[in-house]
C-alpha cells in the first residue's frame, strides 16, 4: 500500500512538472512572439486604415499589448484622424465623402484574434472589437460629385488585397460614446449626443462580400441606441428630451420613444418674454417610427428617404396670446408645406401616419380676459408624398392629408387637405365634413373668443370646401342645424365673469339669427367663406377661422361686419389702456385712503397728547 501511494505521488509530480514546463514554454513563446510580432501587427493595422481609406485617414496610438495565449490585443491612446489635405484634393475632384470622422479613445480591445493567420495567411480573424466611451466628431461637409476622367472604381477589398486576403470580425461594439455632429464649413457643433451605443454585426471584407445583398457596408447589420438625450433650444425657451432612439441599417428602421419639447415658462409669461405674438408649443410624442429608411442615400448624399413615418400617442399644445402686439413677419412661411421647404435636409417620406394625436390650439382674448381652446382629439390618418426633394417634386408636387378626428370634443371631423408643395404663395385646398353636434359644447370657445354664449342648437352636419393661400381663403359651406338661440355678452371687469346683453340678445335672436337651416319649406342655404388672412395668422388659425366664418354667415351674423385685425388691435390697445388707467386710479385712491387714515391717526394722537399735557399741568 505504501509503495502504491508513493507511485501515485510520483505520477502527479511528473504531471505537475510537465504542466509547469508547458506553461513556462508557452509563456516564453508568448513573450517572444509578442515582442517579435508587435511591430509587425502595429504596421499591419496602420496600413489597413491608411490604404483602405485611400490615404484619407491615419491611425496613431501610444502602445499596443499582445497576448498570444488569449489572442487579445489592447491598444492605448488612439487617434483616428482625417487628412484635410487629402480631403480638400478629393473635393476638387468630386470624390470627397459627405462625412469625415475624428475618433479619440483611451483604450481599444480586440479579442480572440488569430495572430498567426495575419502573418501566414494574410487574413484577419477575430471575435470582437470593443471601444469604451469614445469621443467621436462626425463632420458634415457639403460636397459636390463631379465627373472625372480618372476615378478609382476599385472596391474596398481591392484596395487592401495586396496587404490582406480578408478581414472578418464577428462583432464591433461602441459603448457609451459621445458624438458631436460638426459643420465642416464653420466648425460649429450642430448637435451633440451622449450615451450612444453602436453594434456592428459580422463585418466581412473579402472578394465576395461586396456583392452580398444581405449585407450593409460589408456587415450583417449596424444598429444603434441612444438614451437620455437632452438639449436646450438656441433661444433657451424650450427643453428637448428623448428617452431612447434606436435603429437598424438592415431593418431600415429608426424608433424614437418619449420625445418632448417643453416650454421653459408658463403660457402668459412665455408670450410676454417674446414681445410679439408668437406661438408657444408644448409637444409630447410617445412613439415616432421610421420604416424603410434608405441609409445608403442618407450617408452618401445626406438625403432622408423613408417609406413611412408613424407618430402615435402624441399631444401637441399651441398657445397664442392676442394681448401681445403682432410681429412684422408673415407666419405663412410656417405653414406645414412652406416649413418643409426650409428643412436643411432633403427629405422624402412616402406616407406620414398619424395615430391618436391630440391637438389643442388656445388663444388668450385680452378683451374677455379668458382663454378659448380648439380641441382636435384622436387625430388619425395619413399624409402622402411629404417631400422637399426636387426629383420627387418633378413627379408629384402635391402632398395630400386624409384625416379623421374628434372636433372640440363634440363632433366627428373628416378633412382632406391638398398642399401644393411648389407654390410660392403657400396655396392649398381643404374640404371636410363635421357630423352631429350639440352647439352648446362650443361655449368654451365662443364665450372666450367671441363673447357669444349658445343657449341651444343642434347641428346635423357641416360640409365645407375651401381654397386657401397666404392671402386668406375662399370657399363655401353648408351647415344643417336647428333650434339655435344665443346670448350676446359683454366683458367683465376686475376678473368678473362676462355679462349678458339682454336687449341685444333678444334682438339678435329675433331679427338676426336664423335658428335653422334649411328653413321650413325652403332649400338649404349655402354660405360663402371669405377670410382675409392677417400676416400674423398661423396655419391652424386660418383653418378654424375659415370654418368659423362659414358658420357665422350661415346663422345670419354675416350682416354684422367683423373688425379688421388693425381695428381689433386698436380695441385691444384701448381696452388695455383703460384698464391700466383704472388700476392707476384705484392705486391712487388706495394711497389717498391710506394717507387719510394716517392723518386721522396723527390727529387722534395729537389730541391725546394735548389732553395728557393739560391734565399734567392741572
Where are the predicted features?
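Flexible, solvent-exposed coil segments and beta strand-coil junctions
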Residues: 84-91, 148-157, 223, 265-272, ...
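Extended terminal
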Residues: 2-18, 420, 433, 446, ...
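N-terminal type II signal-anchor transmembrane helix
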Residues: 2-55
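Flexible, surface-exposed loop regions and adjacent strand-edge segments
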Residues: 143-151, 324-329, 450, 492-499
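Short, surface-exposed polybasic-and-hydrophobic patches located at secondary-structure transitions
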Residues: 126-135, 147-155, 159-161, 189-204, ...
Amino acid at each position: 500500500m505504501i509503495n502504491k501511494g508513493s507511485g501515485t505521488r510520483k505520477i502527479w509530480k511528473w504531471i505537475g512538472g510537465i504542466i509547469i514546463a508547458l506553461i513556462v514554454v508557452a509563456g516564453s513563446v508568448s513573450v517572444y512572439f509578442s515582442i517579435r510580432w508587435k511591430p509587425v501587427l502595429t504596421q499591419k493595422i496602420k496600413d489597413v486604415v491608411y490604404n483602405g481609406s485611400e490615404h484619407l485617414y491615419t491611425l496613431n496610438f501610444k502602445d499596443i499589448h499582445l497576448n498570444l495565449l488569449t489572442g487579445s490585443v489592447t491598444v492605448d491612446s488612439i487617434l483616428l484622424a482625417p487628412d484635410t489635405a487629402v480631403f480638400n484634393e478629393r473635393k476638387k475632384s468630386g470624390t470627397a465623402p459627405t462625412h469625415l470622422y475624428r475618433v479619440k479613445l483611451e483604450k481599444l480591445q480586440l479579442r480572440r484574434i488569430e495572430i498567426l493567420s495575419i502573418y501566414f495567411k494574410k487574413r484577419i480573424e477575430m471575435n470582437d472589437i470593443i471601444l469604451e466611451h469614445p469621443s467621436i466628431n462626425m463632420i458634415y461637409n457639403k460636397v459636390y460629385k463631379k465627373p472625372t476622367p480618372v476615378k478609382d472604381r476599385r472596391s474596398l477589398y481591392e484596395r487592401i488585397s495586396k496587404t490582406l486576403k480578408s478581414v472578418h470580425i464577428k462583432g464591433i461594439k461602441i459603448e457609451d460614446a459621445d458624438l458631436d455632429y460638426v459643420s465642416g464649413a464653420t466648425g460649429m457643433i450642430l448637435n451633440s449626443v451622449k450615451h450612444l451605443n453602436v453594434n456592428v454585426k459580422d463585418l466581412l471584407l473579402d472578394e465576395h462580400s461586396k456583392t452580398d445583398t444581405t449585407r450593409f457596408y460589408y456587415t450583417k447589420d449596424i444598429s444603434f441606441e441612444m438614451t437620455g438625450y437632452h438639449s436646450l433650444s438656441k433661444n433657451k425657451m424650450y427643453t428637448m428630451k428623448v428617452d431612447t432612439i434606436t435603429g437598424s441599417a438592415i431593418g431600415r428602421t429608426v424608433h424614437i420613444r418619449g420625445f418632448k419639447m417643453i416650454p421653459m415658462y408658463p403660457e402668459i409669461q412665455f408670450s410676454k418674454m417674446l414681445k410679439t405674438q408668437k406661438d408657444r408649443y408644448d409637444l409630447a410624442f410617445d412613439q415616432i417610427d421610421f420604416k424603410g429608411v434608405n441609409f445608403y442615400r442618407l450617408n452618401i448624399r445626406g438625403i432622408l428617404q423613408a417609406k413611412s413615418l408613424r407618430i402615435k400617442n402624441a399631444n401637441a399644445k399651441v398657445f397664442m396670446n392676442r394681448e401681445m402686439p403682432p410681429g412684422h413677419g408673415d407666419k405663412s412661411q410656417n405653414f406645414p408645406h412652406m416649413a418643409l421647404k426650409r428643412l436643411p435636409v432633403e427629405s422624402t417620406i412616402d406616407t406620414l401616419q398619424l395615430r391618436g394625436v391630440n391637438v389643442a390650439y388656445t388663444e388668450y382674448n385680452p378683451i374677455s380676459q379668458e382663454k378659448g381652446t380648439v380641441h382636435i382629439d384622436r387625430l388619425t390618418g395619413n399624409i402622402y408624398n411629404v417631400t422637399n426633394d426636387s426629383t420627387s417634386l418633378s413627379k408629384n408636387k402635391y402632398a395630400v392629408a386624409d384625416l379623421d378626428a374628434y372636433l372640440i370634443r363634440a363632433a366627428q371631423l373628416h378633412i382632406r387637405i391638398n398642399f401644393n408643395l411648389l407654390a410660392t404663395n403657400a396655396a392649398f385646398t381643404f374640404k371636410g365634413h363635421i357630423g352631429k353636434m350639440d352647439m352648446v359644447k362650443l361655449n368654451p370657445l365662443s364665450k372666450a373668443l367671441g363673447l357669444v354664449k349658445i343657449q341651444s342648437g343642434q347641428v346635423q352636419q357641416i360640409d365645407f370646401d375651401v381654397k386657401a393661400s397666404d392671402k386668406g381663403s375662399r370657399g363655401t359651406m353648408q351647415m344643417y342645424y336647428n333650434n339655435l338661440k344665443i346670448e350676446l355678452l359683454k366683458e367683465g371687469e376686475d376678473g368678473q365673469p362676462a355679462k349678458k346683453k339682454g336687449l341685444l340678445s333678444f334682438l339678435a335672436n329675433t331679427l338676426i339669427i336664423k335658428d335653422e337651416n334649411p328653413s321650413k319649406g325652403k332649400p338649404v342655404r349655402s354660405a360663402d367663406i371669405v377670410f382675409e388672412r392677417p400676416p400674423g395668422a398661423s396655419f391652424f388659425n386660418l383653418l378654424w377661422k375659415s370654418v368659423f366664418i362659414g358658420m357665422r354667415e350661415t346663422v345670419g351674423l354675416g350682416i354684422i361686419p367683423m373688425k379688421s385685425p388693425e381695428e381689433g388691435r386698436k380695441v385691444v390697445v384701448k381696452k388695455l389702456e383703460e384698464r391700466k388707467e383704472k388700476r392707476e386710479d384705484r392705486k391712487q385712491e388706495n394711497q389717498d385712503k391710506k394717507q387719510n387714515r394716517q392723518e386721522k391717526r396723527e390727529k387722534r394722537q395729537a389730541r391725546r397728547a394735548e389732553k395728557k399735557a393739560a391734565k399734567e399741568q392741572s
